[in-house]
């Protein structure tokens, strides 16, 4: 049985998806999708411990997805870590206003991402497999 917390990562870039897998798959149960609608579907189907979210995506961007999730009572306390190339101070404020728990900028250090997720999930990092 897998006792690792489940991380849902949402990014439309296949390259970033692979970077997220490389950084997280040994430590967490990782689900990856490239769009907001798939992410919403997975939120209702899986026990997600933390959402890792890009801002710039087609159709519904990460800020809108974050606001949508925060308006759903069952996800008001879900930790949301934005990982994005938008690095201006105003961008970070927009992320906070949308409901992000943490805001990291790309390129990210894998260890920084793991530690951020560990901090918001509140459970010890699983040993790498």
Please provide the spans of the model-predicted regions.
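Conserved acidic segment of CheY-like receiver
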Residues: 3-14, 20-21, 51-52
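Two-component/phosphorelay signaling modules centered on CheY-like receiver
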Residues: 14-32
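Acidic, metal-coordinating helix/loop segments flanking the phosphotransfer/catalytic sites
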Residues: 32-50
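Receiver (REC) domain active-site loop signature in two-component systems and cognate sites
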Residues: 57
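C-terminal output helix
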Residues: 108-117
């Amino acid at each position: 049985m897998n006792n690792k917390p489940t991380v849902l990562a949402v990014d439309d870039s296949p390259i970033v998806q692979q970077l997220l897998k490389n950084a997280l798959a040994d430590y967490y149960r990782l689900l990856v999708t490239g769009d907001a609608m798939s992410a919403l579907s997975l939120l209702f189907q899986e026990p997600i411990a933390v959402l890792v979210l890009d801002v710039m995506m087609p159709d519904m961007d990460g800020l809108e997805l974050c606001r949508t999730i925060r308006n759903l009572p069952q996800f008001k306390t879900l930790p949301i870590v934005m990982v994005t190339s938008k690095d201006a101070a105003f961008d970070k404020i927009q992320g906070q206003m949308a409901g992000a728990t943490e805001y990291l900028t790309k390129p990210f250090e894998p260890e920084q991402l793991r530690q951020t997720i560990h901090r918001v999930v509140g459970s010890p990092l699983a040993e790498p497999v």
